[in-house]
């Protein structure tokens, strides 16, 4: 790897007006504008590093401001020194003695960290001419473990245990890499038909289309009312059937108390969902445990993680047996490094990884992480959410074929956005360039659509 120095950075506030057609609508977030708090690391080479954090509109500018503070700590640093001891670099980035006060390791500052750390990985991958997943797949167990800051999680897993676990997976790794290169490492599931704001006709149409496209796992948003959800799940089962190998999942996006979640899901149990996602507050470890215990006799699992702020919270969810499914988020956690730590804990305690991927840029990110989990860590096929929106704005968008993610082969982390898309949807943007300066944007800007 030739010597590369980070010379500067930029953040960009990019917002797509998805609230206009209710894409992404759920019981908690009725009308979000899918957004990227975007980070670009500039260098003295031909390469730049691109990372982003997903939000749903207002407040995206706050994350961009935080990105500037975190990225400033990289200015003047040589890439080779940053990646030589990734665990040390990660701790350096989270340990600014003043910035950590507004975390620590959670909230806006941690969202910003995710964007910046992922931009470093993107830059590193480009200099090596590899996709991010392949960098990790080519690591030795010791190199993988050196990417992680084990502070706060050694009661769950030690570096020595992690190396031993990864070494056990080495035997079949070459075969799994070959499967990845044949696009058979990451089966996809779809949420495209399940948004809460969609009408019956649109829901039926999208279910039929995704079924015909090879999907066998389908997620539906719930939490509006029991009656309406029973009607919508009835529509889903009418099309998918109960005994055709089609799996149904439901997602409440945190709207219920613990007793409400238990009662509500008992009333939906006849539709045989695999799991209920985010049934209550994402911070309530004991609440998730109570819900899981209550729903186990009904064959319904509990999934959460898209709002889980760091590896410490995941440690608690996993070690207490509060979840059946671990839903890592590529940029709510502190980038690739913290995800690698959670993959190890999930493997040790037998909890499958099903990443959160319902947002702009998230499928592009998580296809790498699910591939890493299968090839390097768990050795077991899982599924990964795919939301078929906004991929046209990326240089190397994620692609689904025959129900599988097509494993990325281009160098980088797949979230580099087209310059024209960033210009068109930058907020507040330049007059005559940004969509947000047009009359079309007024219903959102005036609060009529949100």
Swiss-Prot record:
CDD domains: rTSbeta_L-fuconate_dehydratase
The EC number(s) this enzyme carries: 4.2.1.146
Necessary cofactors: Mg(2+)
Keywords from the UniProt entry: Carbohydrate metabolism, Lyase, Magnesium, Metal-binding
Domain of life according to the entry: Eukaryota
Gene Ontology molecular function, alphabetical: carbonate dehydratase activity; L-fuconate dehydratase activity; magnesium ion binding
Pathway involvement of the protein, from the record: Carbohydrate acid metabolism
Residues forming the catalytic site: 221, 356
Catalysis performed (reactions): L-galactonate = 2-dehydro-3-deoxy-L-galactonate + H2O
SMART domains, per the entry: MR_MLE (SM00922)
GO aspect biological process, one term: amino acid catabolic process
PANTHER family for this protein: ENOLASE SUPERFAMILY, MANDELATE RACEMASE, MITOCHONDRIAL ENOLASE SUPERFAMILY MEMBER 1
Similarity annotation: Belongs to the mandelate racemase/muconate lactonizing enzyme family.
Protein's name in the database: L-galactonate dehydratase
Protein species of origin: Hypocrea jecorina
Gene: lgd1
